[in-house]
Amino acid sequence: MERIKELRDLMSQSRTREILTKTTVDHMAIIKKYTSGRQEKNPALRMKWMMAMKYPITADKRIMGMIPERNEQGQTLWSKTNDAGSDRVMVSPLAVTWWNRNGPTTSTIHYPKVYKTYFEKVERLKRGTFGPVHFRNQVKIRRRVDINPGHADLSAKEAQDVIMEVVFPNEVGARILTSESQLTITKEKREELQDCKIAPLMVAYMLERELVRKTRFLPVAGGTSSVYVEVLHLTQGTCWEQMYTPGGEVRNDDVDQSLIIAARNIVRRATVSADPLASLLEMCHSTQIGGIRMVDILRQNPTEEQAVDICKAAMGLRISSSFSFGGFTFKRTSGSSVKREEEVLTGNLQTLKLRVHEGYEEFTIVGRRATAILRKATRRLIQLIVSGRDEQSIAEAIIVAMVFSQEDCMIKAVRGDLNFVNRANQRLNPMHQLLRHFQKDAKVLFQNWGIEPIDNVMGMIGILPDMTPSTVMSMRGVRVSKMGVDEYSSTERVVVSIDRFLRVRDQRGNVLLSPEEVSEAQGTEKLTITYSSSMMWEINGPESVLINTYQWVIRNWETVKIQWSQDPTMLYNKMEFEPFQSLVPKAARGQYSGFVRTLFQQMRDVLGTFDTVQIIKLLPFAAAPPEQSRMQFSSLTVNVRGSGMRILVRGNSPVFNYNKATKRLTVLGKDAGALTEDPDEGTAGVESAVLRGFLILGKEDKRYGPALSINELSNLAKGEKANVLIGQGDVVLVMKRKRDSSILTDSQTATKRIRMAIN
């Protein structure tokens, strides 16, 4: 207070005021403060001071040929004196005015395209509605919010590659555009920006806004989606808020919202299945949101919500340290190990010094043509899920993983001495010795590995030592997945692990998330969510379960039929029949199942009693654990449309109606698909029987010579094409399959394609 009083006294004296306002500023400290460093200390003042000068702007000398020396009013537009310290010319602000009025004009067609985000923002604000202002205390929470509406979800690196490709296509530097979104955007933008005269750097900045999600940690009360965040300064102050309804939605907000709904539905469903973790993964892999695979969105989308994070944890999205082995990139996604030297003996009694990894670890293994997930313990492969383009690529990945596991049976499978050298003629380290050995010939390795019977997990099959697929046996711990094991990419801040009950833990073992944390809130998704997994059939109610079950049976009838006659138990255990059980009255499930299984057994025993329609109709009932009883049923009840409806064991009903004339099945009045006639019923033409192992390409093509008879087909080499005479004298072009795995579906496809080729 004393100081303030003293200052007031001083200021009241006119002499003090005069000194302060009139004296020149020549104190060294002050001069230093305003002149040291490149950073402008008082930009506003500097601007005012500069603009007060006659020629505050410098320009390239070429400007002298483009702008007259004086304007219409006779004012000088540029000075003949050079700018000190550069060879540029000094220019008056009036030159800018002249240029704007009289300078060259250019096409504006590219402006809305380049400045798309700004144009769209203006539209949203124009269409938006601002409501009343309320004065009240604002409770704000700092949240990480998306500040950039209308962006794609590319990572910074992906976006950088796209921008370089579009804006600076001739610059040197390796750029690999891998994702579908990258390629699509690049193509689109190249077309849009042809002959664009806007400065490339500006285009690059604007593209970045469109491609990358920008987040900030901001205090927010209320809406956090990007269309609200862009008007935060208009809608909430410290003590007031203004009601606002955005004038349009943007896809990135819709993706975030729909992702949360999908993740919640999936976690809720997985929690009640026998193996929650496997179920959750299967559902994430087979779900699409707005036409994009959910796993792809999870990988790129930083939304932090419990269910979403559980899904991410299940997919192994976390910080990873990657290394390369056998041409594959390994990223540890979980677990830890300590290294220890150990001496081991090969099958040839050669001693190898191995650095053994002790401990449980999980890895993603990513190569160009194959990918895998590996779970291993000390010198033991627990599980390997591989997917690849072809047999060869899958074999490569399996060899690499088996060697990496350091299992004893792998080391004992070595025949002969290991003495591989590198180009410099130096011996390779033991792990690479083993790798090279088995890459040359893995027969003994695969034979010695051991095989085991397998459960039927959707999307996965077994693989035998000779690399043929199987649905009943597989090399120990090894499975082949139809879906790629996706490359690991992550924005997560911590490493987490998840158990089969979907509990997510950090590295210290603290539980971070569990299904109990997942909100029960229901919402309507903005984008279409397509759940392909049978586990999600029930999300749209009992009718959907009924129709989906029968559609699945019809779609897979060729395989189902074979299993029905050869391995019914495996068929009854298919997860696709699980949802159906909830429709069958609990008390009747076991009795129905026992009855249907007995009926099926009689069909198998008594030749000629095979009835396709009846098998399809009753099959889902056989999936429940059967009760032995002598009960007979003429109809079976299912609970749909709020009451029990009957399916007649023999004959049609509103629930299950097969039209013999059209060969189409309707379930609850909805079309469930067509039944191709069955060879077992003696009615199918010779073509479907003959054309197994062949692909029908279309109508006859004279270039491939005269039509062969059906018997001459057997002489074709794999991949060879020929015309063939079928059925009633029609000729079609066929190709012998390169592999035999899909023979089952050939006869179905053949029948369809013959019809198309002939018509």
Curated annotation (Swiss-Prot):
Pfam families: Flu_PB2_1st, Flu_PB2_2nd, Flu_PB2_3rd, Flu_PB2_4th, Flu_PB2_5th, Flu_PB2_6th, Flu_PB2_7th. A motif (Nuclear localization signal) lies at residues 736-739. It is found in: Virion; Host nucleus. Transmembrane segments: none annotated. The record marks E627 as: Avian adaptation. SUPFAM superfamilies: PB2 C-terminal domain-like. Belongs to the influenza viruses PB2 family. Influenza RNA polymerase is composed of three subunits: PB1, PB2 and PA. Interacts (via N-terminus) with PB1 (via C-terminus). Interacts with nucleoprotein NP (via N-terminus). This is Polymerase basic protein 2.
